[in-house]
Amino acid sequence: MSVPNSKEQSLLDDASTLLLFSKGKKRAEEASKIGSKTDTIEHDESHEREKKGAIEMAAAALATASTVSLPLKKATEQSAAEAATSTAAKEETENQPQKQPQWPVPDSYIVDPDAGIITCICDLNDDDGFTIQCDHCNRWQHAICYGIKDIGMAPDDYLCNSCDPREVDINLARKIQQERINVKTVEPSSSNNSASNKNNGRDRASSTTISDVGDSFSTDQDNTNHRDKRRKRNPSNNSIDSKNESASVNSSDGLTSMPKKKEHFLSAKDAYGAIYLPLKDNVFKSDLIEPFLNKHMDDNWVIQYPHKTFKSVSIEVKPYADIAYSRTYPGFTKLGVYLKKDCIKGDFIQEILGELDFYKNYLTDPRNHYRIWGTAKRRVIFHSHWPIYIDARLSGNSTRYLRRSCQPNVELVTIKLQDTDNRNDKSSGRKSSRIKFVLRALRDISEDEELYIKWQWDSKHPILKLIKGMTIDSLDDLERYGLINSVETILSNGECGCGNNSKDCYLLKVKRYAQSLYKSVKSRGKMNNRYKLNEILNQYNCKKRREPPILHRLEEKAQNTIERAPILLNNFYRQKFLNRNNGPKIPQKNTIDSTNNPDDIAKPFKFALFAQHSSNISVPKKNETSEKPLIITKSTDYDESHITNIEELPIPVLLPINKTSRQTANDVEESQSKNEHKLSRTPSLSNFNKELSKEAQHSQAKTKEIMTEASVNSRRESTPESIMHLSDFSSSQLHSKKKLSFADYRKKLLK
């Protein structure tokens, strides 16, 4: 038998020690049970037991040694070879490229961490107040559906069932959520915190500690242990007011809250009858409505009802779409009127009640926005023949929830009940009207089918052109943008009964066209469709034709001035000459004749003002024989400094002067140059400036000559000799005033 090595010897020593400890412990227990014995007997017995224990220990050691195989050296070599083989295999696996684990969901399934999307195994995507986020796909799930009942059970690393497939009780999760929906309860703390929540009402921030009268129960150890868990917790009641709620401290749990009372609220389906004033008969907003109805109750379109009381068909108000789990509130309740039993075409279904007023008052009220809508608002119906309307926005009956559609199945008609002797309303004490406004079926309507009435568009609304077969692109810009604005406003306050997927709805056609138009607007950030429409309208209002270059505009302006100036001057002087009396006589009084002469019609506006001023001045009447015009023979003899009456001032007369041959030649050259200028294309800027300066100098010289001639003629003697002398003087004046060019002036200096 070989000698055991150090390792084997240590194993034997440990075995003997354990055996000795167990025997000693057992012997001590037995000694405690025996009781009190003499010291001598105990000493003998202990000596025998020790001897016996040593024998047993030796026997156990020998038995243990016999179990060890003899060739220990060979086993050691074999274990060393196996260790070397495992080390080599490990190195080979490390050198080989490791395969990354494949997720069971594609990358497209992963969403943004702040998206706030809920995807749970219960197939309900609403927030129940306690959700947890997956670390891989960043989607949120109901914690209760995965068996997480409170915050303490939230794990540090969490994966949903899609990212980490495992056995989850889906039926139980659906049952829990269905029970929550059926209860329809809302905790008061969740309603208080709804304003501060983010990501569609779900706040992903860490929950705060519940406090009572300012005392804090959180500890540093709790914050360290649950730091990662708080990132995933989403209790809807993340903060509770200490005045309304209290907390109790438990030795095992750290923090627990008191049970909360559940408050039951009515849904829109059950509470619709409490948001309006129910009526039993129509209310007249104007005192003239009732006389109007009594006067026109025998019109042709009024239907004679064969009974004394109206018998209606049962209807029901219920939601046409479930908005309890929608992420955004549309701004209006989605309720409709449904029929409880079948009816055929022409049956009278239900009476419409509300406040009656004249159609004109609705149009003139700016709160109705009829200029934008172009139709009646929700719960308002226009009468098709009379200038009245029924307003059920504040009071009425269940027909106020009637929706409009492009394919209606009911219409509003007027019926007249049979006359009775005592038709008094017991509640109001007034005589009830025989005229009723009821709904009539346009076709056969089956049970549980929603009732629709037609849209009552204005006669000038652009949508009527679409109904007649025109397209939106065929409309002009003003009608197109007005139509988009009107339809967007209408759909933001209600929906058409045609549905969101109808191809025959004209409102949806306009909405789809507007959506394609909004895509063309480039916005820096998130922008509402209303703002995009305003941007389009602003661009349309500010849209102008691109202006030509400044030089081209200046040339056109100067060209127009050159062309218009001679015409305006000629017309002015011709009219001025025609408005003067021919002859050498200058009348001093009564220059304005009250008779309708042809010359007075063509007089300028200033003469009309002067005539109005002179008519207000009282002039003393004189005999017709004494009213003789004063003829001035010499202008130097006349002194006008002492004249105080404006009618006594002399008016200079422009005498016709024959043109000389040189003036005629200049006019011919003018006309030729003008024609050449018209036929030629746009000249260069330098040539144009030269022509402009020449034309301006010529027109100024011509105007100055005419004014000089007029002033000279008015002050010279009006004899034939003086006229001939004036013509000779004007011709010599023209020759003497000829301007020298720079070249001629230089030649003159050189001489």
From Swiss-Prot:
Record PTM Phosphothreonine, positions in chain: T719
Zinc fingers (PHD-type) by residue: 117-166
Residues with the Phosphoserine modification: S236, S684, S718, S741
Keywords per UniProt: Activator, Chromatin regulator, Meiosis, Metal-binding, Phosphoprotein, Repressor, Transcription, Transcription regulation, Zinc, Zinc-finger
Record's keyword annotation contains ATP-binding: no
Pfam family, one: SET
SUPFAM superfamilies: FYVE/PHD zinc finger (SSF57903), SET domain (SSF82199)
Positions of the SET domain: 313-456
Gene Ontology biological process terms from the UniProt entry: cellular response to starvation; DNA damage response; meiotic cell cycle; negative regulation of meiotic nuclear division; regulation of DNA-templated transcription; transcription initiation-coupled chromatin remodeling
Positions of the UniProt region annotated as Disordered: 24-52, 79-105, 181-258, 662-738
Skewed-composition ranges (Polar residues): 206-222, 235-255, 681-690
Ranges annotated as biased composition (Basic and acidic residues): 39-52, 691-707
Comp. bias (Low complexity): 79-88, 189-199
One term under GO cellular component: Rpd3L-Expanded complex
Keyword Hydrolase: no
Function: Transcriptional regulator that acts via the formation of large multiprotein complexes that modify and/or remodel the chromatin. Required for both gene activation and repression. Part of the Set3C complex, which is required to repress early/middle sporulation genes during meiosis. Required for the transcriptional activation of genes with high activity.
Miscellaneous notes: Present with 623 molecules/cell in log phase SD medium.
Family membership: Belongs to the SET3 family.
Assembly information from the UniProt record: Identified in the Set3C complex with HOS2, HST1, SNT1, SIF2, CPR1 and HOS4/YIL112W.
Record-given protein name: SET domain-containing protein 3
Record lineage: Eukaryota, Fungi, Dikarya, Ascomycota, Saccharomycotina
Record gene name: SET3
